């Protein structure tokens, strides 16, 4: 019988089992597919230090430590703010890698119990306004209640309406109140700038509740 091997399996280098019969693969794949990650973002990510980003050696070390202990990070209700003025130097990749790792450790036995989500903040704000494809109440509930959410490119725009602000504030505030872990990525490195874009109430809930790690290396795009 021909073995059903998936070339995109996260364990392909260390496993020879039939993916079609693998409970681990099935449960991890379900988490990935329902998290909001694109297929390209579901693939394993390799991050490394080279001449372009050698300035980030300590930041990579700190991020690697969080990633290696991501279950403790979530269980301790911690938040993370990964920021950089540079584009393409690993902010989003690190956040996704942490979400992958959390799924790896916690997906087993959690089939159809969503553990984490990835959200492009700009897309979310656009969906708040899209009456043809509105954000469902279930989606909002999941954003407020899953163990770990990645808000990618938070504060990427200053053109945020009061309605958008209220929706975003409510989700983030409820996560903080419920002691749910959140990872933010942003090109805003200073609190004062974040406050100008999002206002003090939301900026405080994002920045002051998070461990802040700044990347300064050049982008690879």
Predicted regions and their residues:
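A short, basic N-terminal segment
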Residues: 1-68, 212-213, 217, 221
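Surface-exposed alpha-helical segments enriched in charged/polar residues
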Residues: 64, 68-71, 100, 173
């Amino acid at each position: 019988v021909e073995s059903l091997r998936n070339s995109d399996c996260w364990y392909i280098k260390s496993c020879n089992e039939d993916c079609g019969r693998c409970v681990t693969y099935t449960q991890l794949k379900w988490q990935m597919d329902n998290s909001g990650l694109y297929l390209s973002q579901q693939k394993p990510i390799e991050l490394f230090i080279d001449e372009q980003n050698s300035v980030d050696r300590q930041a990579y070390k700190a991020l690697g430590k969080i990633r290696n202990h991501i279950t403790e990070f979530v269980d301790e209700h911690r938040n993370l703010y990964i920021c950089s003025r540079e584009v393409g130097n690993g902010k989003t990749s690190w956040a996704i890698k942490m979400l992958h790792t959390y799924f790896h450790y916690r997906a087993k036995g959690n089939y159809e119990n969503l553990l984490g989500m990835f959200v492009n903040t700009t897309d979310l704000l656009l969906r708040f306004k899209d009456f043809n494809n509105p954000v469902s109440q279930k989606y909002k509930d999941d954003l407020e209640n899953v163990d770990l959410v990645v808000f990618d490119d938070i504060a990427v725009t200053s053109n945020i309406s009061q309605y958008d602000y209220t929706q975003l504030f409510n989700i983030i505030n409820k996560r903080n109140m419920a002691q749910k872990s959140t990872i933010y990525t942003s090109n805003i490195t200073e609190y004062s700038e974040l406050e100008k874009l999002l206002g003090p109430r939301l900026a405080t809930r994002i920045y002051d509740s998070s461990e802040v790690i700044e990347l300064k290396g050049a982008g690879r795009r």
